[in-house]
Amino acid sequence: MNRRITVSALAAAVVLAACGSEPPPPNYGTDPELGEYERGLLPSMVIANPAEWGDRMPVVPEGYEVSAIATDLLIPRQTLVLPNGDILVAEGRGGNAPRLKPKDVVAGPIKAAGTTSVTSGNRLTLLRDADGDGTYELQTVFADNLNAPYGLAMIENRIYVANQDALVRFEYSEGQTQARGPPVTVTELPSEINHHWTKAMTASADGRYLYVGIGSNSNITERGMTAEQDRAVIWQIDPLTGMHREYASGLRNPTALTIQPGSGQLWAVVNERDELGPNLVPDYLTAVQEGGFYGWPYSYWGQNPDPRVMPQDEEKVASAITPDYALGSHTATLGVDFSVPAMGPEFSDGVFVGMHGSWNRSVPVGYKVVFVPFRNGRPYGDPIDFVTGFRDDDNTYGRPVGVTVDPRGALIVADDLANIIWRVTPTQPFDVPQAEGAGGAAATGSGATDGDAAEPRATDAAERADGEAPQTPAEPTGTSG
């Protein structure tokens, strides 16, 4: 049974909002159907009642199997596979932005109805499978007293954590199960208001840069443009000095980042704006161009002006880059990572995408992990369901967040409703050559192993100690999200 709100006026408003027509156009892929925008007092809002998995399990394709490798976590968000195969899990809930309008008061309880009731962990948990049999015997707290940790990356012997207010680091030795002290702050991150609090992160494999996604402070500038300073952007950060610069802008909420193997291209998944109807605007996957502008707040899906933004900026709209691949409207995509050959030929060339699921559609979407195939280095064709079964007509059993590919042949999925980490593997291993250089500059998840990784030069900090922003490499290198 769907969660009911007992306040009669609220219930009436929600019912009226849900009465509009909601045909589901195919607003996914490289050329989505956008349709006309719709305006109303409230969006359609349906959240299925959270329920225990019980004997149920997520559904995966034939030839694959799924298991729960960690349970009883405290809101797991993103994961990082370390060079020795250990997994770090970032646990936490952030953000406490004030509600601006009556609609925010209405939507708040409905959003909350589809989330876990446990207290935020504000910690990192380490998982270990000592004998490689797929059972993670060790589940222990690696570090606590963090502030809504989300993005994770590793460069050489340091683990980087993107809290909601700062980028911090821990020294690390292979096999270590607990941090040896409090983290060192690399740089503060924008945190005032924190309407979108998550700070996604990935590392270049040569260890020179971290990329951090910083979401907007509103849906569509309700707090004014001053509140959007250093928001809806991706920062490029020097991990040695903390110096940073804006790498790309106009991305409303970049919730996960990854680097494409081979090309070194930075990719992001982005949550788009609300309140233009159930079928606008699609969340998206895109290659991130240095200096690129992706539309927010002035336009969506390239150069389609948002009618609510006044005054408009025609030059900004004209410069907006059309994203590479639409993921559907309101899917709340929160995870992305490139696959590897060990995941099997059908799922070896492309990205896995974690969809947390909608709250503002009468016909729910998302609540699954999909695979987006690539051809010649670009997204191609329709998305393929890879992990489903997180909800049915009556109940929600889980909500996927981060997805991380273990290069040995496994997909790690964080479920922040059931507080479980799922692991999906082929039932029979695929015979593929192992990549050389495992355990190089960055670990898989928020910054992945690359055989060409190079240790950051000791001279980098001195060369940039004059306060200048770090110079961008011609082509950022690395893998993972």
Where are the language model's segments positioned?
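Compositionally biased, proline/threonine/alanine/serine-rich low-complexity intrinsically disordered stretches
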Residues: 433-481
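Structural WD40 beta-propeller signal
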Residues: 72, 82, 155, 204-206, ...
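Conserved beta-propeller blade signature
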Residues: 86-88, 158-161, 209-213, 265-269, ...
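C-terminal motif of bacterial Sec signal peptides marking the signal peptidase cleavage site
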Residues: 16-18
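Asp-box/WD-like beta-propeller blade repeats and closely related beta-sheet repeat scaffolds
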Residues: 138-155, 163-204
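Surface loop/turn motifs at the tips and blade-to-blade linkers of beta-strand repeat domains
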Residues: 70-72, 140-146, 186-193, 246-250, ...
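Beta-propeller domain segments
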Residues: 21-60, 96-99, 113-114, 119, ...
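Hydrophobic core register within WD40 beta-propeller blades
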Residues: 79, 152, 201, 254-257, ...
